[in-house]
Amino acid sequence: MTASERELAEQLNRRLRHVVLMLRRVSADQPITSQQLSVLGSLEHGPRRMTELADEHGVRLPTMTAQINRLERDGLVTRGRDAADARVVTAGLTEAGRDRLAAGREQRIGFLAERFADLTKEERDAVAAALPALDKLLGAP
């Protein structure tokens, strides 16, 4: 790693931290935490194994189980069993969970869209041009 790569990594780290904290503040009035909203997002395309969710979110299985317990209690997720292995517990979104995810996502996107309105066209174009490199850097799908 070169000194310039390290400096760029430090600058990006600071900005990512700021973005995460800013979006958490925007979502502070939501009835669920930003972490719970993130878990709902992980279930958007269908039920997932609890172990997969824990791995994706970088937490231990008991921590994810506690998150799913709260979301299930609130009617946002349901538990099921894996069709291939009935011993495996899965979690999936309910309609209420989909609605909550959509509302949380819309709140964040609306906030960011307002912020983009403060930028010049050239600044917005620069952000848009950086997105493919950020996807590659962060391993985004």
Regions found by a protein language model. Name each.
Residues N69-A129:
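Charged, amphipathic alpha-helical coiled-coil/dimerization segments
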